[in-house]
């Protein structure tokens, strides 16, 4: 599982054999996993006596200069654990492929890929989980974003990759579906999300324009309106009497960083920070 948010979104251990190997990419310790992993997942891990491993590929990618690209690290970790071919041989093949693919981009790029390959193979940590996981009923619980029957009965199972299990009877006889349901998805897949620095913002709105998921948007608030977040005076005569706010929907953001890249300010008006540090605050602001 390459994204920690998937543990509460999908049944990531479904179909795994007894004694199988499960690799998770997360920043969590065993103690943190007690409340970050859902009870059903912990049950499956313990009951099937899985060999459970963790790797913090996001941290490793930053350390070796790969930015937010974790694919090479995860692939190396896979070969280390899977033994489809000898791990040393797999690493040699991966390095040969990296050199062939990136040699024209310079030795530095090749070296960073080599470092990522080595890091993936050497930074795997085995998780010695307790036997109590087999029967525990405690763990992460996903809060429903809406009680809309169409979402809970139809869309939610599809988002969890269980659409094939839905009966035909649950569908509308005339084939109609409500619109605007993507607002309920709230995937929360970003590792880092942008936060707004009002002082540095020129109100150009380029960040909102470039966002591929429309999850960062400008808002105008009438002067005198009580709001729990930071604002600044809106620029332009036509906006006199209004305050300006650039607001993120943290759980809709994918963490691509396009908004930060496009910001023309010398001191960027947006800064990427870990999702978990702002999820609650920024989520409430968006709502």
Task: State each model region's role.
Residues 90, 103-252, 260-287:
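Ferredoxin-type iron-sulfur electron-transfer modules and their immediate structural context
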Residues 1-157, 225-230, 282-287:
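Active-site cofactor/cluster-binding pocket
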């Amino acid at each position: 599982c390459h994204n920690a948010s998937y543990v509460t979104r999908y049944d990531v251990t479904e179909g795994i054999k007894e004694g199988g190997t499960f690799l998770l990419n997360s920043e969590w310790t065993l103690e943190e996993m007690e409340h970050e992993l859902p009870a059903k997942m912990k049950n499956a891990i313990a009951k099937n006596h899985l060999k459970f491993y963790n790797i913090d590929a996001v941290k490793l990618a930053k350390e070796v200069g790969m930015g937010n690209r974790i694919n090479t690290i995860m692939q190396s970790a896979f070969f280390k654990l899977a033994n489809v071919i000898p791990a040393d041989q797999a690493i040699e093949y991966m390095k040969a492929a990296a050199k062939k693919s990136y040699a024209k981009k310079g030795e530095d790029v090749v070296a960073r890929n080599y470092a990522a390959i080595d890091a993936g193979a050497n930074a795997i940590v085995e998780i010695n989980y307790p036997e109590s996981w087999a029967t525990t009923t405690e763990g992460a619980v996903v809060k429903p974003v809406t009680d809309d029957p169409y979402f809970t009965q139809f869309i939610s199972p599809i988002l969890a990759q269980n659409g094939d299990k839905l009966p035909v009877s649950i569908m509308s006889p005339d084939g109609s579906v409500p619109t605007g349901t993507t607002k309920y998805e709230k995937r929360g897949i970003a590792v880092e999300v942008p936060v707004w620095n009002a002082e540095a913002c020129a109100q150009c709105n380029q960040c909102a324009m470039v966002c591929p998921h429309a999850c960062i948007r400008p808002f105008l608030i009438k002067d005198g309106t009580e709001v729990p977040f930071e604002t600044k005076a809106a620029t332009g005569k036509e906006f006199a009497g209004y305050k300006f706010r650039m607001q993120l929907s943290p759980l809709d953001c994918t963490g691509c960083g396009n908004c930060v890249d496009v910001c023309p300010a010398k001191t960027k008006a947006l800064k990427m920070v870990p999702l978990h540090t702002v999820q609650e605050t920024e989520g409430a602001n968006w709502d």
